[in-house]
Amino acid sequence: MPQFLFVPGGKRSAQDFDSVRGLLRAQGRLSDAITLSDPEQNDLSQHIAEVCALVEEGDAKELHLCGHSYASFVITGAADRLRGRIARLVFIDTLIPESGRSLFDFFKQAGIDPTAFGVPAWPPFVEPLTFDEAAFAALPKTYLHCLRSQFLSLTAGIPADLQSRLASENWTYCALDADHYCMIDQPAAVVERITG
């Protein structure tokens, strides 16, 4: 039975996953969540190191690393450093990182001002992430797409993009009728998708 580690997005707290973790606990499943250090003071590399340190302290045999929003960059970077320790990555209403690009790069490509979404130019959001794309493609991955997300203008193209990559890059796609904070809005639906 897999264990789950939840990583919230920028300036958010591990408490965002309390309801999800409570439902998992009721099923006899183990989970943990981390609050990342202040994104105004620390960068993406530091956040990746924090997740790696927590994983390395534990002894999970089948760990599913789950990242919400900005944390997709964190879990991707952590999985790259922890090869063999992560069984699956779960992307919760987020962008899918590409090696050599930052979160801000995706906003720029879409012609969207990040500050309009309350995303300032803090260090983690402008630092490019570099990782082994072949190793990433080989790792099983789940994408939870929130259809009422405040960030739909950024994520609307993901279903079509993933359709061509489902089999070759080990993706599972799930749509949720939820807003961006689905783990708060619909925790039972999140649990169903990540344990099914």
Where are these regions (language model features)?
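Active-site catalytic motif of lipid deacylating hydrolases and related acyltransferases
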Residues: P2-D59, Y173, D179
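Gly/Ala-rich beta-loop-alpha elbow adjacent to hydrolase catalytic centers
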Residues: C66-I75
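Flexible "cap/lid" loop of the alpha/beta hydrolase fold
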Residues: D80, G84-P114, P123-F125, L152, ...
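Conserved loop-alpha-helix segment in the C-terminal half of the alpha/beta-hydrolase fold
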Residues: L147-D177, I184
